[in-house]
Amino acid sequence: VGPMAEQVWLGTFHALAARMLRRHADLVGLSSDFTILDMDDQNRVLKQLMVADDIDPKRWPVRLLGGVIQRWKDRGLTPDKVGVAEAGDLANGRLRQLYEAYQARLLALNAVDFGDLLLHMLTVFRAHPDVLAEYHGRITHIMVDEYQDTNVAQYLWLRLLTGPHHNLCCVGDDDQSIYGWRGAEVGNICLLYTSDAADDLGR
């Protein structure tokens, strides 16, 4: 392939986001040696916070509340972006506050969960245009396979990373979407056509 191949960044969304986040961890209050928690550790942290806030884990199973928080992250929603109506009566009406406390505890532990890898990089890109511009200079062409299985956070990350080049190629089949249970939004295919960048991105 030649020496140019050494400049290619190849990996999953989360692997590439983790690579970026290690470089810019300080911008979100982490250090570069942060730990990525597995599901058991996530649930353990969340349960501790629930007990401290008098939220009964028997009435509100940890996996249920943790699943809702992860779905919010899959949609690119930080605690301040979650609407009151959307949180509803979950966790005695305090799920937004629990999400906020969970994020604060992860920062104190110098840890992230799977959803944070993209969520934190969305925060970095939006708050630090100089960092985003650096990646625009480094990454000029992007190709995504199995695009039908991307979630909203991945779509937003792509939109920001594509930047002024608009050199984005996505391969996907809406009939083959199998990860809806994990936050995948087959509607992301339609967003490529309806977004304000659609004419530049091509079809």
Describe every region a protein language model picked out:
Residues 1-68, 73, 81-86:
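Conserved P-loop NTPase-based nucleic-acid remodeling module centered on helicase motor cores
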Residues 1-2, 191-195:
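Short, conserved catalytic or adaptor-binding loops enriched in Gly and charged residues
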Residues 25-26, 46, 169-172, 195:
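Short acidic (Asp/Glu) and glycine-rich catalytic loops that position anionic groups and cofactors
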